[in-house]
């Protein structure tokens, strides 16, 4: 009997045998019939309206159109058409999440507040003044609305801007670039679809290059030591709104209307350098209390929720009342129509 020679490991027969064995050992893989795509909600950018120049806050400029480099407008890039009115959709409350994590998150954010609060941001700025800061933020506010960004993004933008101003002198001709860079950094933290660099540069009418923006972004991140998650007015407004509803001090619809009005008041205060001395939690509770007063809420929010001195609360409330009185027309462009009617604000001119 002739003994067959052993098959060489590299022979075709051996390779075929290994393939058969491998196929027997592998588990069958069920292939998806259709590709799984992430569901995207439609985003509705807003068209900011020009406001009169006699208000205390600088005019909210119309969002500039695309530059000559052919960059598309924010509305087209985000896949939506502008809403007919200036109001954003009213948020919804998540009371179960608040019950589970609300107090822990509040205690953590409150402890961080002093570390992230920029004081005397313009003390080291020979070329940047409170007026130029007001003009820049009055331009950035409608830009953030045109992109359909959240109020949290705007608050983080202002915090990043002011904290950088406390560390580094900025030339006047680079101040606008710092503004859009701060907006980009904030949006990367919060937004699912942040604006593209090309879009932001187009808003500056081609005054800056992509390399300049990227270089300044690196400088800002290094100066701030990559600590970017600052507690904001937006966070504290949401916390106080949930707290009053959970405690049975207000109905959900009533609390949400007060929160929307308080956001409008807080948005006005962001552009005013006089309010940088107040912490975000103090501003949030005062804006909410003023909103309750304007809406004639039967059970206004308790000012003691924020654990602030009474003198500081009265001082901040007085300045906010004056701010709203001077900028009542500007405030109508930030609010839903039904809220303007309830608090007797002048109608928005379309």
UniProtKB/Swiss-Prot annotation:
GO biological process terms on file: cell division; cilium assembly; G1/S transition of mitotic cell cycle; mitotic cell cycle; multi-ciliated epithelial cell differentiation; seminiferous tubule development; single fertilization; spermatogenesis
A single GO molecular function term of this UniProt record: cyclin-dependent protein serine/threonine kinase regulator activity
Biased amino acid composition, Basic residues: 28-42
Tissue: Present in respiratory cells (at protein level).
Compartments in which it is found: Cytoplasm; Nucleus, Nucleolus
Lineage top rank: taxon: Eukaryota
InterPro entries hit by this protein: Cyclin (IPR039361), Cyclin-like_dom (IPR013763), Cyclin-like_sf (IPR036915), Cyclin_C-dom (IPR004367), Cyclin_N (IPR006671)
GO cellular component: centriolar satellite; cyclin-dependent protein kinase holoenzyme complex; cytoplasm; microtubule organizing center; nucleolus; nucleus
Keyword terms, alphabetized: Cell cycle, Cell division, Ciliopathy, Cilium biogenesis/degradation, Cyclin, Cytoplasm, Disease variant, Nucleus, Phosphoprotein, Primary ciliary dyskinesia
SUPFAM superfamilies, alphabetized: Cyclin-like (SSF47954)
Coiled coil regions in record: none
Pfam families for this protein: Cyclin_C, Cyclin_N
Residue positions, PTM Phosphoserine: 81
UniProt keyword Iron, yes or no: no
Keyword match Isomerase: no
Main location: cytoplasm
Region Disordered, residue ranges: 1-89
Protein function: Specifically required for generation of multiciliated cells, possibly by promoting a cell cycle state compatible with centriole amplification and maturation. Acts downstream of MCIDAS to promote mother centriole amplification and maturation in preparation for apical docking.
Family: Belongs to the cyclin family.
Disease: Ciliary dyskinesia, primary, 29: A disorder characterized by abnormalities of motile cilia. Respiratory infections leading to chronic inflammation and bronchiectasis are recurrent, due to defects in the respiratory cilia. CILD29 patients do not exhibit situs inversus, a congenital abnormality in which visceral organs are opposite to their normal positions (situs solitus) due to lateral transposition.
Protein name: Cyclin-O
Organism field: Homo sapiens (Human)
Lineage: Eukaryota, Metazoa, Chordata, Craniata, Vertebrata
């Amino acid at each position: 009997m002739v003994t067959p020679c052993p098959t060489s490991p590299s022979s075709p027969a051996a390779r075929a045998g290994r393939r058969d064995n491998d196929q027997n050992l592998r588990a069958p893989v069920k292939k998806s019939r259709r590709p799984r795509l992430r569901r995207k909600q439609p985003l509705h950018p807003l068209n900011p309206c020009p406001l009169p120049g006699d208000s205390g806050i600088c005019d909210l400029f119309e969002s500039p159109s695309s530059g000559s480099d052919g960059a598309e407008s924010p509305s087209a890039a985000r896949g939506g058409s502008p809403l007919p009115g200036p109001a954003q959709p009213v948020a919804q409350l998540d009371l179960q999440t608040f019950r589970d994590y609300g107090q822990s998150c509040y205690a953590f954010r409150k402890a961080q507040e002093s570390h992230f609060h920029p004081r005397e941001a313009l003390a080291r700025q020979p070329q940047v003044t409170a007026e130029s800061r007001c003009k820049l933020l009055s331009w950035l506010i409608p830009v953030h609305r045109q992109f359909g960004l959240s109020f949290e993004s705007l608050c983080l933008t202002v915090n990043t801007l002011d904290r950088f101003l406390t560390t580094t002198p900025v030339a006047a001709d680079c101040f606008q670039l710092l503004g859009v860079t701060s907006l980009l950094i904030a949006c990367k933290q919060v937004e699912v679809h942040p604006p593209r660099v090309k879009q932001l540069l187009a808003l500056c009418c081609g005054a800056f290059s992509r390399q300049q923006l990227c270089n300044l972004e690196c400088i800002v991140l290094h100066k701030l030591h990559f600590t970017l998650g600052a507690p904001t007015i937006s966070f504290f407004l949401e916390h106080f709104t949930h707290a009053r509803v959970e405690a049975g001090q207000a109905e959900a619809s009533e609390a949400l209307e007060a929160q929307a009005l308080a956001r409008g008041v807080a948005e006005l205060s962001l552009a005013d350098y006089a309010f940088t001395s107040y912490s975000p939690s103090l501003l949030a509770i005062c804006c909410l209390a003023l909103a309750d007063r304007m809406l004639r809420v039967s059970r206004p929010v308790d000012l003691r929720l924020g654990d602030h001195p009474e003198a500081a609360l009265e001082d901040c409330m007085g300045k906010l009342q004056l701010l709203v009185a001077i900028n009542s027309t500007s405030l109508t462009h930030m609010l839903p129509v039904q809220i303007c009617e309830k608090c007797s604000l002048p109608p928005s001119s379309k």
